[in-house]
Amino acid sequence: MVGRGKGKGREHVLLVVFPAQGHISPALQLAFKIVAHSSIDLTFLTSSSAVASILIGLPPTAPALNFAAFSQGNLHNDDDDDDDAKDYMHTLCKHGSQSVRDIIHSTKKGQGQGQGQGQGQGQGQGHPITRILYTTLLPWAADVAREFRLPSVLLWTQPVTTFLTFHYYFTGYEDAINKVRNQQGTEDDSTIQLPRLPLLSSRDLHSFMLPSNPFKGAINTFKEHLEALDAEETPPTILVNSYDALEEEALQAMIPKYKTMGIGPLIPSSVFDTRETTCEVVSLVPDLAQKSKDDCQWHGWLNSKAEGSVIYVSFGSHVKQSKAQTEEIAKGLLASGHPFLWVITSNEEEEGDEIMEQNLVEEIQEKGMMIVPWCAQFQVLKHPSVGCFMTHCGWNSTLESIACGVPMIGFPKMFDQPTISKLIAHVWKVGVRVNAAVDGIVGQEVIKNCIESVMDPDGIGRELNENVRKFMSLGKKAAEEGGSSHNNFKAFLQDMTGGTTTIN
């Protein structure tokens, strides 16, 4: 229940979201929490294609939000097209910032924009925008907020550790980090000890920092984030999709400069439900990568497997493996002797007629293993038969795996994934990490050995399971009433409403 006292006018938040699954998922969770626990109106702004996918996938039971959209342009699937990425970000900034201005103007005039969702139109579309929330990679949203003298809040959708790495890079540690990053691809194993962070080598850094990074201008976006925060007249608020027990040292390091509030994990609350999942469980976060209705065959298949015996393999919606790498993964999985459920997206299949040699496909089929184009990930991770998650180490996937108590095999490729893999394997010790050969391919023996390590009930596997269950419990406690994330979220709501909102 929500109590609201008398005071200032109705609060209307504009939440501006980068149009990618890793940003939309936590942003939607935050949006739902805000409208469910307060009288605050909220407009969710992202690209037109993302809004279309969200509206198709949202169940009627989802809390009502207003949705608005901007054009995002086109980003091709080339992994090394720097010009294409620059054009995309420029288009995003141009159309996105103009949409923010238009919405602010229209709500001032009482002409609400956007599409309602749920039971008819969303409520409060005519109330003026009073605050802007924006996700990672959209620093221009804070600039527009300042144009209108509106407060802005950053929703950081990566680990706090990643934020700090960029912060240090642009505030005196650039030369030291460059010395380490320039060792990429060499035998040198130099590391750097940044304040209150784990030792980092070149293989642990965000890919935007590395010489091999194809998107040369991308790192400037993070510099713009810091500049936008520094431009605030009062200590800026940063909401982070993490929790105190998971990144305690990193969160403490943020305190002197930023008002940082861990409100994670921003995942469906049903993840913490101890009841056995079914295929029909509804998620309030549509998957933008889902291109067809889930036939749920995977659920019956999982039901037929022993507890903790299945390897779940998924590398997210944007990571594509080469044919050579896919074949090594297949051989390693088959050699492990464990049943596996492997998500190979339609994007990967579109790269060519064959994702692997036909004889491997036939062997996988003969042994009764399962390959699917899509499945409801958190429902899979909750299933008792799943004992290991081979993951690209996206932040949402990592938080979901921890919340479900499933240890991981880190298979990072780009962005924040190497840093997250470092945290998984060496800081939290809830998984292991693959090592690639000189040619960049992770061999079948490495994959097989990683599986054996995680699935070993008497060796390292036991320790990994104990650790992941510990952090699962700590995450659940953080989200519960009186927990750190619950209290931070409550404080954030009260800050927005002048202390007039209470959560029971």
Curated annotation (Swiss-Prot):
Enzyme Commission number(s) from the entry: 2.4.1.298
Pfam family, one: UDPGT
Compositionally biased region (Gly residues): 111-125
Binding, an anthocyanidin: H23
Keywords from the named record: Glycosyltransferase, Transferase
Coiled-coil regions, chain positions: none
Catalytic activity reported: an anthocyanidin 3-O-beta-D-glucoside + UDP-alpha-D-glucose = an anthocyanidin 3,5-di-O-beta-D-glucoside + UDP + 2 H(+)
GO MF term set: hexosyltransferase activity; quercetin 3-O-glucosyltransferase activity; quercetin 7-O-glucosyltransferase activity; UDP-D-glucose:delphinidin 3-O-glucosyl-5-O-caffeoylglucoside -O-beta-D-glucosyltransferase activity
Any one Gene Ontology BP term: anthocyanin-containing compound biosynthetic process
Active site per UniProt: H23 (proton acceptor)
EC class: transferase
Pathway(s) it belongs to: Pigment biosynthesis; anthocyanin biosynthesis
Gene3D superfamilies assigned: Glycogen Phosphorylase B
Region (Disordered): 107-126
InterPro entries: UDP_glucos_trans, UDP_glycos_trans_CS
Family affiliation: Belongs to the UDP-glycosyltransferase family.
Function: Catalyzes the glucosylation at the O-5 position of anthocyanidin 3-glucosides to form anthocyanidin 3,5-di-O-glucosides using UDP-glucose as sugar donor. Anthocyanidin 3,5-di-O-glucosides are molecules that are responsible for pigmentation. Involved in biosynsthesis of accumulate gentiodelphin, a unique polyacylated delphinidin-type anthocyanin, in the petals. Also acts on anthocyanidin 3-O-(6-O-malonylglucoside). Much less active with hydroxycinnamoylglucose derivatives. No activity in the absence of the 3-O-glucoside group.
Record protein name field: Anthocyanidin 3-O-glucoside 5-O-glucosyltransferase
Species name: Gentiana triflora
